[in-house]
């Protein structure tokens, strides 16, 4: 009888193990189901992109002519910009040299440094005023007034 009791005891344990395995399998299937859903969602997203691409290929004839007209306008604008680039390069060459007094050599950050902009503007005007007067005299000589 002791053997029968052991077998009886062993059988419920085997059943419990099977139930646990079934529960675990269900959980795994549910997890895989969520994974399948995410992969299905990815497939849907890819599918949407493909559809969108197909729509881009099917352009009505009216819009094709409009795009061609816009392309012509863009080409004209590009030619105009190329002519102005030469003038901009000349303007950039006229820039004054960097004043070494404005360079901070301490290596520290300049945050919270109090700057008196009014004073700086006056100093710059005083320095540039001499240069401006020279330029104005040259311009006056080149410019002739016709009466």
Curated annotation (Swiss-Prot):
Entry's Pfam families?
Answer: CHZ
- Provide the coiled-coil residue spans: none
Q: Where is the composition biased (Basic residues)?
A: 44-53
Which keywords label this protein? Chaperone, Nucleus
Please tell me one Gene Ontology term that the record gives under cellular component. Answer: nucleus
Where do the segments described as Disordered lie?
1-98, 128-147
Q: Where in the cell is it found?
A: Nucleus
Where are the compositionally biased (Basic and acidic residues) regions?
A: 1-25, 33-43, 54-68
Compositionally biased, Acidic residues: which spans? 69-97, 133-147
Q: Give the record's family classification.
A: Belongs to the CHZ1 family.
Functional summary from the UniProt entry: Forms a chaperone-bound H2A.Z-H2B complex that acts as a source for SWR1 complex-dependent H2A to H2A.Z histone replacement in chromatin.
Instruction: Report quaternary structure and partners.
Output: Forms a heterotrimer with H2A.Z-H2B, stabilizing the association of the histone dimer. Also, with a lower affinity, forms a heterotrimer with H2A-H2B.
**What is the protein name stated in its UniProt record?**
Histone H2A.Z-specific chaperone CHZ1
Biological source species: Scheffersomyces stipitis (strain ATCC 58785 / CBS 6054 / NBRC 10063 / NRRL Y-11545) (Yeast)
């Amino acid at each position: 009888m002791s053997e029968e009791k052991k077998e009886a005891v062993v059988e419920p344990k085997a059943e419990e193990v099977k139930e646990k395995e079934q529960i675990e399998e269900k959980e795994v299937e549910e997890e895989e189901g969520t994974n399948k859903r995410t992969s299905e969602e990815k497939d849907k997203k890819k599918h949407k992109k493909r559809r969108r691409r197909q729509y881009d290929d099917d352009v009505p004839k009216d819009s094709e002519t409009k795009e061609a007209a816009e392309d012509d306008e863009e080409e004209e604008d590009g030619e105009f910009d190329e002519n102005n680039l030469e003038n901009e390069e000349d303007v950039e060459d006229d820039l004054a040299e960097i004043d070494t007094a404005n360079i901070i050599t301490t290596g520290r950050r300049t945050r919270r440094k109090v700057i008196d902009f009014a004073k700086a503007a006056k100093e710059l005007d005083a320095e540039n005023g001499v240069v401006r007067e020279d330029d104005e005299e040259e311009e006056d000589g080149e410019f002739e007034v016709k009466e």
